[in-house]
Amino acid sequence: MQITADMVKKLREMTGAGVMECKTALTEADGDFEKAVEVLRKRGAAVAQKKAGRLTKEGIVTSYIHFNDKIGVLLELGCETDFVARMPEFKELAYNLAKHVAAMNPKYVTREDVPEEVLEKEKEIYRAQLENSNKPAAVVEKIVQGKLEKFYEEVCLYDQKYIFDDEKTVKEVVDELIGKIRENIRVTRFVRMRVGEE
């Protein structure tokens, strides 16, 4: 299929990706926009993987106060350069992530941040729940792993479904912006406060 400039322009408007990236994605997808978007998303994740080890010494701290003044969030979104820290897309992502934290109340940024003793306690609880199930040990361990995945989705920001697009996780949303701007971005930390909670 012939890839036209209008097709490339339309895909760029949809995704924000570069001209050549859009053209290549459309070529790979034989002009199918949905497939081209998927190609770009996969590439964004690949780019994010390559950039993951790079330091994020720049960034911003953003805040969100819920309309009733009962919940507030401070969130630090790190990046490699101050140029990216000033980009509207970067600031918008930081603010939306702060809103996400206010709504979903994660406890940790990534699953790697969950302390080992917390994981062991959760596994202990899951095994105790299955103690009298008469299931083989291997099956019990699979069930425990499945429950742990659910636990991560509840308490880890990056594993949660993004409230503004529940087709994606927060990590996928962050990875998409990494793929678009070609620079490492990461949520460094956040604090969520609610009136009356410690």
Curated annotation (Swiss-Prot):
GO MF: translation elongation factor activity
Keywords: Cytoplasm, Elongation factor, Protein biosynthesis
Upper taxonomic lineage: Bacteria, Thermotogati, Thermotogota, Thermotogae, Thermotogales
Family: Belongs to the EF-Ts family.
UniProt keyword Protein biosynthesis present: yes
GN (gene name): tsf
Protein species of origin: Pseudothermotoga lettingae (strain ATCC BAA-301 / DSM 14385 / NBRC 107922 / TMO)
Record flagged with keyword Lipid metabolism: no
HAMAP family assigned: EF_Ts
Chain intervals for the UniProt region annotation (Involved in Mg(2+) ion dislocation from EF-Tu): 81-84
Bilayer-crossing regions: none
Pfam family membership, one: EF_TS
Protein name per the record: Elongation factor Ts
Localization: Cytoplasm
UniProt cross-references to CDD domains, sorted A to Z: UBA_EF-Ts
Main subcellular location: cytoplasm
Protein purpose: Associates with the EF-Tu.GDP complex and induces the exchange of GDP to GTP. It remains bound to the aminoacyl-tRNA.EF-Tu.GTP complex up to the GTP hydrolysis stage on the ribosome.
One CC-aspect GO term: cytoplasm
InterPro entries: EF-Ts_dimer_sf, Transl_elong_EFTs/EF1B, Transl_elong_EFTs/EF1B_dimer, Transl_elong_Ts_CS, UBA-like_sf
